[in-house]
UniProtKB/Swiss-Prot annotation:
GO terms for biological process: mRNA processing; regulation of gene expression; rRNA processing; tRNA processing. It comes from the Bacteria. This is Ribonuclease 3. Residues 1-23 are annotated as: Disordered. Its EC number is 3.1.26.3. Mg(2+) binds at E77, D150, E153. GO terms for cellular component: cytoplasm. The lineage of its organism: Bacteria, Bacillati, Bacillota, Bacilli, Bacillales. Gene3D superfamilies: 3.30.160.20, Ribonuclease III domain. It is found in: Cytoplasm. PANTHER family: RIBONUCLEASE 3, RIBONUCLEASE III. Its cofactor is Mg(2+).
Amino acid sequence: MPHSKNQRKHRHHSHSERRRQPKRLTLTAKQQQMFDELLRTLNLTFANKKLLVQAFTHSSYVNEHRIQSCKDNERLEFLGDAVLELAVSQYLYKAFEQMSEGDMTKLRASIVCEPSLAQLAEELHFGELVLLGKGEEMTGGRKRPALLADVFESFVGALYLDQGMDAVYLFLERTIYPKISEGAFSHMMDFKSQLQEFIQRDNLGHIHYEIVQERGPAHNREFVSEVVLNNETLGVGTGRSKKEAEQHAAQQALITLSQKKEQ
């Protein structure tokens, strides 16, 4: 039986609708495996996996693939930036009780700046997970510091939305906080002066520094310094120079004194 005009018209619309259906973002098995491996490494879970993937989705990928249901990571980056500032501020406030507002601001700026966040993202292999457009890929976007720093922030934003602030603190305890404690950002701070002020203000006694060890070949020397207060070692630090080792030792001493004050 020949099809009526209406039936032919309806069938034509069905084909058009099928053709116009929005594309969906589908991860390859390898990409899915990489995301799973990341969560295992960080000992984290995501209830909403779409948020996790969004954190690694660059705007160039969305624009190139025209996937309607797929969002880029820019809004998550905006949120993550604020969450990261709060989490780092709280850590500094608690760990360095004697530090002035101005010094905390300087130290925080050195921690959440682009080079620092890009390095952290690189250490976590975030670049390998980013969904990029071909143009961005060809121009080396996967290794671009600005892009990596943005992804670190968007990941923090996604983690906050999915799991809350406690999960963010746990993540930072495995990534940023140990580096602060180890003095990775201490080139921005004069911890020796801060320690001296702290000791004098509270009349705790007299401190002195001792280089207790030198190790490594002459061209790659490493020094170990102790800072001692009234015959008690308050902090130990290492560095490529005696001054750097003393700065790191002073930073450890400040953390020790802050913890003692809380007890």
